[in-house]
Swiss-Prot record:
Protein family (similarity comment): Belongs to the MurCDEF family.
Enzyme Commission numbers on file: 6.3.2.8
Pathway, per record: Cell wall biogenesis; peptidoglycan biosynthesis
Keyword terms: ATP-binding, Cell cycle, Cell division, Cell shape, Cell wall biogenesis/degradation, Cytoplasm, Ligase, Nucleotide-binding, Peptidoglycan synthesis
Protein name in UniProt: UDP-N-acetylmuramate--L-alanine ligase
Catalytic activity: UDP-N-acetyl-alpha-D-muramate + L-alanine + ATP = UDP-N-acetyl-alpha-D-muramoyl-L-alanine + ADP + phosphate + H(+)
Subcellular location, record wording: Cytoplasm
One cellular component term from this protein's GO annotations in UniProt: cytoplasm
Major location (coarse): cytoplasm
GO terms classed as biological process: cell division; cell wall organization; peptidoglycan biosynthetic process; regulation of cell shape
Amino acid sequence: MFRGKVRHIHFIGIGGSGMNGIAQVLLNQGFTVTGSDLKESQTVINLKNMGAKIYIGHDPKNVDGADVVVYSSAVKQDNPELLRAKQLGIPTIPRGEMLAELMRFKYGIAIAGSHGKTTTTSMVGTILGKTGYDPTVVIGGKLEAYGSNAKLGSGDFIVTEADESDGSFLKLTPTIVSINNIDLEHIGFYKNLNDIKRAFIDFANKVPFYGAVAVNIDDQNIKDIIPEIEKKIIRFGISEDSDIRGYDLRLENGRYRFKVNDFGEIYLSIPGKHNVYNALAAISISVELGVPFCVIKEALENFKNANRRFEIKYDGSVTVIDDYAHHPTEIKATLSATREMFDGRRIIAVFQPHRYSRTFSLYDHFVRSFNIPDITVITEIFPAGESPIDSVNGEKLSSDIKKETGKTVLYGEDLQKTFNILKNILKKDDVLLILGAGNVTRLSDQISQFLKNKEGALR
C-alpha cells in the first residue's frame, strides 16, 4: 500500500456509510485523516474520537495540506473542496479507488450484488474471525461485534462490500468474489438491466486465475451472465444444480433451519429466506478457503447482523424493527421475514422512499410491494441531494398503494406527522417496521422512546 509521500488523507462526505469505514482503517494504520460532512452524526463523532479532524460543511480551505482527497459518489463535481483540490494539484480519487488500495496487498474478498452485501460481508468477516485469520473488514453498516463498520485485522484477508452503484467496484482487485443477485437499480448511472449485467461480468472476470466467483444459481439475471464468466465458478442456492446447496428448509420460530450439502445443518440466527441465500454465499467463500463446517455453523448460528438490518429497536408491548430496505425487492423480502417471524400479529410498515430517480424508475414495483402490512404509512421522498420529479411524490405513492392493496395506507408526509399518526394507531402486540435508507431511522428511536414511556398503557 502507498506510503511515503501520502500521509494526510482528506474525505469529502466522511460520514457516509461507504466512506467512514475506509477512514477508520486508515486511522488505525497511522495516517492523518481529515474530512468534511454536511452535518454532525454519531459516525462523525466516533471518527473524531478516533483522531480524525472533521469539519461540518464544505469549505475550500478544508483540503489544505492534504496529500490526496477521497470523495463519495454523492459528492458533485462542483463541490468547493473538490474544485480547490484540483486547483492545487492534489490527487482526487473516488472512494472505490481508495478501497482498492486497501485491498491491493491483501487477499481480497469482495461481496457484490444488488441486495444483501452488508449482511453477507458481515457473515464472512464473522466466520473468518472465528478461524483466527483476523481479517480486515469494511462494511456499509455498524456491526455490533466491532462496534463500528470497519475492523483493521492483522491477517492477510480483507473482506469488503463491492459497490456497483457508480461502477467503482471495477477498481477492486479481489481474489474471491460473491455475486448474490442482480436487479434493476441505479438507473441514474446504468442505462438498463443489460448495462448492469455487463458491469457484473467485468467485475467477475477481474478475479485472477487462482481465484473464484461464487454466484447465486437461483437468480435468473445471474444465470444469464454465467456463460460469460471466465473464472472458476461456485454455484450456490437451493436448486439441485448448486455446488453449495441449502435444502430441507424449515421455518422454526420465524427463522430458517436448513442442511448444507452433506456437511450438516444450520439454524440461522436471523430471519428471512433472503438471508438463507446470504448465508449460502458466505458458506461458499468459507468452504473455498478451507474453513471447517463446524466453525461456519457456530459463526452463523450466533451471528449478529449490522445495524438497520432487521434491527429490533424495542420489544415490549409493541415490537419496533428498523431496516435499511429501500428497493422493492428488499422491501418484499423484509416484509415476508416479518410475517414469518411474527405470524398472527398486526404489522404496520412505515416507508420513506429514497431518491426521486429510484422512486420514478421503479414506481410500479413499489406500488406492488406492500401487500403484507395491515397498515402502511408512506412519508415524502427523501431526496438524497436530488431535485424533485413532478410526476412522483409520497402522497401519490400512498394513494396508488392503497388502490393496489385495498388496505389502510396513510400519507405521513414528514417524520413528525408520521410519528403523530403512529402514536394514534399503535396497539398492544403490533409489529412496527421502519423502512428506508434516508433519515427515517430517527423515527425508530423516537417511537421506541415513546413506547418505553407508555409501556403498559397501550390497549
